[in-house]
Amino acid sequence: MKNIFLHSLNLENYRNFKNLELKIDNIPIILTGENGSGKTNILEAISLFYPGRGLRSSKLTDICKTSEDYCRVKALLQSKLGIADFSTHIKRNSNRRITEYNASKIANNELSKFTSMVWLTPQMEGIFTSSSTDRRKFLDRIVYNFDTKHAELLNKYEYYMHERNKILAEDIRDNNWLKIIEENMANISNIIANNRLKTIRFMQQAIDEIENEFPKADLSIDGIIEQKILNVEEDIVSFIITELYQTRSKDKLLGRTSFGIHKSDFLVKHQKKNILAKFCSTGEQKAILIAIILAEMNSTIKLTKITPILLLDEIFVHLDDKRRQYLMDFFTALNIQLWVTATNLDGIENFANKAQLIKL
C-alpha cells in the first residue's frame, strides 16, 4: 500500500497568507479558526497539486494575495514515486501557473502520475442541480484516481475539438487535416468513455457492498457514446468519425462541436427512492454526495493500493450524531492523511484527540 501525504506545506502570498509554514504528519489534521481565517484556502492550496484548477476552480488572479505580483505554494510530498518537492507558482500579470516536480517543470495534467486526492466542499453540495458540465468534471476528477492518463486525454480532446471548430469556422479547405483531427477525437473519445464507464462500475460496486449511515446511490452516465459502448452495438471509433463528419455543416453554423463525450452527463439516483438526486432534499443531496466520496475512497484504496489525501471542508456541519460518529470511525480506520476544517471541535472531541490540530 502506498500512502500519499504531505510532510510540509509552505504558502507565500497565497490569498490571506503572507507566509505560512506547516509541518505535518501522516495523520488526520484539523484546521480550526473563525470564518475568514483561511482554513479553506489551505485546502485549496493542497488541491493545486492535482489536475485541474483546484477545489474552488478559481481564476489564477484571485489566488494571489491582494497587492502582490505573485504567489507560490511549496510542498514536500510522499508521492506515488517517492518523497519529492513540489511547487506551483503564479504570476499575476501572466495569468499562468507553473508547476514543478523536483525543480523540473511538469504539465498540470501530469500531476495524477504523482498524487492522488479526493475532496468535498460545501460548494459541491449543489452538484446535482448544477450543470452537466460540473457533474461531468466531478466524474472525471474521480477517474483521475484510477487512470493517471485521463487528465492528459481530456486535454488532448479539448485541443483537437478546438482545432476542428477553428477549421470549420475559418472555412479552411483542408479535408485531410480535418479527417485526421476527427480520427484523433474518435480514438481519444473511445478511451475517455471507457474510463468513465469503468470508474462508475468500480464506484457502484463499492456503494453496493458497503453498509453505512448514508443513502445508497445508483450511478450512470447519460451519453450517446457511452450508451453504444454498453450496448456493444458497433465499432465505436468508426461511429464517432461518421457522426463528426456528418455534423460538420451544422457545427460550422453553431460555431461549436455538437456531438461528443463533452456532452455526457453524470447521473446519480437515490437508490431506495428511485429518483434522481436533483429531486431530493438538500439534506439528502449532501448525504448522497458523502456516500459517493466514501465509495471513491474505498474503491481507490482497494483497486489501486494507494491511499489518497482527503480534503474535507466543514463536513461535520449539519450532520446528526450517528452520521458524524460513523464518519469519524471511517476516517480513523482508513489510515490516511485527512485534512478537515472546523470552526470549533464541538461534537468531534474524540476524533480531535487522535489528530494534529492547527489553529489559525
Swiss-Prot record:
The keyword DNA repair applies. ATP binds at G33, E34, N35, G36, S37, G38, K39, T40. InterPro entries: DNA-binding_RecF, DNA-binding_RecF_CS, P-loop_NTPase, RecF/RecN/SMC_N, RecF_2. SUPFAM superfamilies: P-loop containing nucleoside triphosphate hydrolases (SSF52540). Keywords: ATP-binding, Cytoplasm, DNA damage, DNA repair, DNA replication, DNA-binding, Nucleotide-binding, SOS response. One of its GO terms (molecular function) is ATP binding. GO terms for biological process: DNA replication; DNA synthesis involved in DNA repair; double-strand break repair; SOS response. One of its GO terms (cellular component) is cytoplasm. It is found in: Cytoplasm. Its main location: cytoplasm. The RecF protein is involved in DNA metabolism; it is required for DNA replication and normal SOS inducibility. RecF binds preferentially to single-stranded, linear DNA. It also seems to bind ATP. Belongs to the RecF family. This is DNA replication and repair protein RecF. The gene is recF.
